[in-house]
């Protein structure tokens, strides 16, 4: 199991990755990368229920992919903003279709 880093009271933001089923209609899977002050599980439920949701996640999101982000969380807000972009770019460089991550 991945070792979690120590966190302070201000470290309550998280990055998360959602597996997307055929987001472009070409038969290929993709990912959505986001950040939140909620738990990734709570944020995913909000997406699926249409609450402050990215349409692509509401429509194509199947599940969270914790192996890609769990070892990074939690973190301060500024770090989460940076990490969201870094994580998205890392997945793009590996050839994946990535939404979000800005």
Identify the role of each PLM range.
Residues 1-45, 78-86:
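GIY-YIG nuclease catalytic motif and its immediate N-terminal context
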Residues 37-81:
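Conserved short loop/helix modules at catalytic or binding sites
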């Amino acid at each position: 199991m991945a070792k979690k880093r120590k966190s302070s009271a201000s470290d309550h933001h998280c990055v998360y990755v959602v597996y997307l089923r055929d987001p472009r209609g070409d038969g290929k899977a993709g990912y959505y990368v986001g950040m939140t002050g909620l738990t990734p599980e709570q944020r995913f439920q909000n997406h699926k229920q249409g609450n402050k949701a990215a349409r692509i996640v509401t429509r194509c999101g199947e599940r969270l992919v914790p192996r890609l982000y769990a070892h990074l969380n939690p973190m301060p807000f500024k770090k989460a903003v940076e990490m969201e972009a870094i994580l998205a770019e890392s997945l793009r460089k590996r050839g994946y279709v990535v939404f979000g991550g800005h």
